[in-house]
Amino acid sequence: AYRIDHVLGFFRIWEIPVHSVHGLLGQFAPALAMSREEIESYGLHFQEDRFTRPFITDWVLDRMFHERAGEVKEKYLDRLDEERYQMKPEVDTQRKVEALFADVADEKELWLRDGLYALISDVLFVRDHTNPGVFHPRISAQLDFIYESLYDNDKAAFNRLYNDYFYRRNNQFWYQEAMKKLP
């Protein structure tokens, strides 16, 4: 016996990139990605580099890693600009971090690994897997530091965009796609 929670689940799948360990950087397929213009129509000035690159700053590192923030900067990060850091190339994906910590059993080191995973997924938007010129809001982005860093009016604009994307725009699209396939 099968239980069907929602019929639209048959017409979409959550795709997780091969470079990810966790699903936060995934996207539905098929899905209607958003252009820069569509994002900005919600009142959110789209800063592509800031919103699609992991949001790593001194205050983020201090809050996440506490007394180990300096160690994280030295071992795993390069300076990107005056405000931000970026992951070193050898740890710039969750899979690379996973491989680096593959033989580690120490709880403190696993905590560090999990923090690095979280840094990598701290983005507001993910690029579409097939068309990198369009974007999807990152699922649950409101729980991350990039969202916290936004002004209140930008948070409100992102929330409108997010709710429309996940609860209207794509539901209608999936319904229309389902109607083409169902008798």
Which residues are covered by each model-predicted region?
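Catalytic cores of glycan-processing enzymes that make or break glycosidic bonds
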Residues: 1-183
